[in-house]
Swiss-Prot record:
SMART domains: PepX_C, PepX_N. Its main location: cytoplasm. The keyword Iron-sulfur does not apply. Pfam families: Peptidase_S15, PepX_C, PepX_N. This is Xaa-Pro dipeptidyl-peptidase. The lineage of its organism: Bacteria, Bacillati, Bacillota, Bacilli, Lactobacillales. Homodimer.
């Protein structure tokens, strides 16, 4: 086990003492050592209400092989050895003596686990207080810090009773859980937008669900975590509308210019406002939906309000879904504008009674994963005031990069046949309310048909519809600080979405952080080896509470999880830069790779059907050395590595080839070859319900990325797809003369990948990708000019 920690601060001793006192501990350096030790260790069992109960708890802790903590304290000690203190500390952190560590040498385990410690014996009360302060900021076996663990057991439950008025509590630069999340005020309002997406002549009203600390009713104003979540009110069965992958790849006869595919913002319609008949300070509707994001729940107990809005076309709101269109961005912005006092909302949909977010400080962070993170990124590119930061996990920065690639229809990994129209149906939760649907069904079906037409599955080309959903075009407007989190094995929302957005905001005068993990499309806030919750606590305390805690400097610019060394996260200055830390090597496919042939015929669709494969089984088979698809691919290998190497950046392919057809699909996979137990792409549960989100409150599982039980022969590092008629970009078209050579350039997905010595790099070049592209039934023959083809590989040195 490794408990990496990036968010721990080390303030000077005076600050440490003041903070210890602030949380209710006896922390006077002039007190006698024995009395201070007794007071402090007793305080660490808040679940024990009496001295007798605390004595029993102390007796359960071993100081060394000869004494319990109760017996040691009874002797009124005047000092404590470093070893004895950390024997006690480890047990307080949830580790077991004799099982997890040796009482004669706790430091062996602490070093392996990356736990901090003082380097000397405790010979004064000041030493004891320093050790206790560090202990409170040390991570437990249950992922959270020790102070968090104490608070989860009731240590801070009476904090507000001792205050003249409700307030936030900061410790080590981070806000603490001194609010009872169980008592949160739950309410619903309807925010008036500027849009009419369902074409009924009225401004769409957007439902927003609010959970705010009860202390706001006593005058406390709080910042807001806002999650734009299209799934919040449920999803629909999309089996009937999911596309069957087409069997014919269309020959493109004409392309377009950049000007022709550039979307121009539409002028907002001059719509009448909803009438206003009064103002209220109390909502009329209870929030019946439960908060569904553990990250937000964690901060609710720390004095942040949490707001969810599903947006246009969802249950209890007006409008139609547009799958990432400007209307969905505007819907998210409308919520922020209400939270900052710049837009009206109503207590219900009919009476015209307005309500303000009087409890809000007007400082907002947007959070969430996938579609939720996408809308956070979209809102940030508007430059809306009040949005201080986004914490965007696996977000889409351009919808073309989600459903298309280089002129091809390319489904997100795991969702073959999905497209923008399918997702629109999936999230159109208005249809769950029959009384609502009967009035809009015909208009919705007409609207949906427009999406199906405009997404253009026939050519897969980039057009104005996709351009309107490319948020990177407006990245220069971003004013909010940005945290991006992405899985390096996320083939659903592929890594290019994060890295291209990261590059687009690189020169902006904002703070920005990037976290890359080895998972697929998953969260990392409950991954034990990373102190992600503390990192974001430090970040949000700075961003939303204005605390000068140095978060922008303390937190690394880039944190990357290693794919070989378990539970290892490394800090870097940037991704794929600076130049002094990176090198690119261009390798010729003929002289630097071994290949049995330079040609293949793509029979993948026939093989797929004959093998009764699925998308998942195909993805395994296509990168397996001995495979049913061996004759439908080109397999190139490099010699085994003599030393460890780390790929970091965007692999780039230059390929000269000829095909026997006027169009074709080319897929490329970069492979780690060699039998090994590699990390699973989904973190395994290590403690069911082990992460507590607040005192007597919700829990979630603690996870960890682990090597698989059985070795595998290969693993996908990166991949890419291209329509061979689109060698330059996704809108200009090249005519292909069958049998005549031509050249293409192809970027693969960004990666950070540790290749151990002895492994081999392999390059798989094939045609249709059964898991992601369409599935043509016509076979195509590919002839690769290996001598005039190369791959450029970026390395961190």
């Amino acid at each position: 086990m490794k408990l990496n920690q990036f968010a721990r601060l080390t303030p000077d001793f005076k600050v440490q003492v003041a903070e210890l006192k602030q949380i209710g501990l006896q922390a006077d350096p002039d007190d006698a050592f024995s009395q201070s030790a007794t007071d402090l260790f007793n305080a660490f069992f808040p679940e024990a209400y009496t001295l007798a109960a605390k004595e029993d708890k102390l007796a359960q802790v071993a100081v060394n092989m000869d004494q319990t903590l109760a017996a040691w304290l009874a002797k009124k000690p005047s000092k404590m050895t470093r070893r004895d203190f950390y024997n006690v500390a480890l047990q307080l952190l949830g580790f077991e003596a004799f099982t997890d560590f040796d009482l004669n040498d706790p430091f062996k385990m602490m070093t392996a686990t990356k736990l901090p410690s003082l380097d000397h014996d405790l010979t004064s009360t000041a030493d004891l207080l320093k050790a206790v302060y560090l202990l409170l900021n040390t991570r437990t076996k249950h992922l959270v810090s020790y102070l968090d663990d104490l608070a989860n057991r009731g240590f801070l439950k009476d904090f507000q009773k001792k205050q003249k008025k409700p307030t936030h509590l900061l410790f080590n630069g981070k806000v603490q859980q001194v609010f009872d999340a169980r008592q949160a005020v739950r309410e619903v309002v309807w925010i008036e937008s500027d849009m009419d997406t369902d074409h009924d002549g009225q401004r769409d009203l957007l439902e927003a669900t609010i959970y705010r600390p009860k202390a706001t009713d006593q005058g406390l104003k709080v910042p807001v975590l806002f999650t734009a979540n299209p799934y919040f009110h449920g999803t629909n069965d999309v089996t009937a509308v999911t596309h069957v992958p087409e069997t014919t790849l269309a020959v493109k006869t004409h392309g377009a210019s950049k000007a022709e595919v550039t979307a121009n913002p539409e002028e907002p319609a001059n719509l009448p406002h909803h009438p206003v008949n009064g103002e209220a300070t109390q909502a009329e509707a209870y929030a019946e939906e439960n908060s569904m994001y553990a990250f937000n729940d964690y901060f609710l107990a720390r004095g942040f309000a949490v707001v969810y809005s599903a947006g246009v076309g969802t249950r209890y709101s007006d409008g139609f879904r547009t799958t990432g269109g400007p209307e969905e961005t505007d819907g998210a912005v409308a919520v922020i504008e209400w939270l900052t006092g710049k837009r009206r909302a109503f207590t219900n949909r009919t009476d015209g009674i307005t309500i303000k977010a009087w409890w809000s400080t007007g400082l907002v962070a947007m959070t969430g994963k996938s579609y939720l993170a996408t809308l956070a990124m979209a809102a940030a590119t508007t430059g809306v005031d009040g949005l201080k930061t986004i914490v965007a996990d696996a977000g889409i920065s351009s919808w073309y990069d989600y459903y298309r690639e280089n002129g091809l229809v390319v489904a997100p990994g795991g969702f073959q046949g999905e497209d923008a129209d399918v997702l629109a149906v999936d999230t159109f939760s208005r249809q769950k309310s029959g009384g609502d649907l009967i009035n809009i069904k015909q208009a919705w079906e007409k609207h949906l048909a427009t999406i199906t037409h405009d997404q253009d599955r026939t050519t897969g080309a980039y057009n104005t519809w996709w351009d309107a959903r490319n948020y990177r075009k407006n990245a220069n407007k971003v004013k909010a600080d940005v945290v991006l989190i992405h899985g390096l094995n996320d083939w659903n929302v592929k890594p290019t979405n994060a890295i291209k957005f990261w590059e687009a905001i690189a020169d902006l005068p904002i703070q920005k952080k990037l976290v890359l993990h080895q998972g697929q499309h998953v969260y990392v806030h409950n991954v034990r080896s990373l102190d992600f919750l503390d990192m974001m606590n430090l970040w949000l305390t700075h961003e939303l509470l204005g605390e000068a805690n140095g978060a922008e400097d303390v937190l690394p610019n880039v944190v990357v999880q290693d794919n070989v060394a378990v539970q290892t996260w490394s800090a870097y200055q940037n991704f794929a830069s600076p130049a002094a830390e990176h090198v690119t090597n261009t390798r010729n496919l003929k002289t630097d790779f071994e290949a049995a042939t330079d040609q293949f015929t793509d029979h993948a669709t026939a093989t797929f059907n004959a093998q009764h494969d699925t998308s998942a089984s195909f993805e395994t088979a296509i990168i397996t050395p001995n495979s049913a698809y061996a004759n439908s691919r080109l397999w190139l290998t490099q010699p085994p590595l003599e030393r460890d190497q780390t790929l970091e950046g965007i692999p780039h392919l230059e390929l000269t080839l000829a095909i026997d057809a006027p169009t074709g699909i080319l897929s490329v996979r970069l492979i780690d070859l060699g039998m090994a137990k590699r990390f699973g792409e989904t973190a395994a549960t290590v403690a069911l319900n082990g992460l507590q989100l607040g005192f007597d409150y919700k829990t979630t599982d603690i996870l960890e990325f682990k090597p698989t039980a059985k070795p595998t022969p290969s693993k996908l590092i990166s991949l890419g797809h291209i329509n061979l008629q689109n060698p330059k970009n996704a809108y200009e078209v090249q005519r292909i003369t069958p049998g005549q050579p031509f050249h293409i350039s192809l970027d693969l997905q960004p990666t950070h990948y540790h290749l151990p010595a002895g492994r081999q790099l392999a390059l798989v070049i094939h045609g249709a990708d059964m898991a992601q592209t369409i599935r043509p039934i016509k076979t195509t023959h590919y002839q690769i000019d290996l001598a005039n083809s190369s791959i450029t590989l970026p390395y961190r040195i």
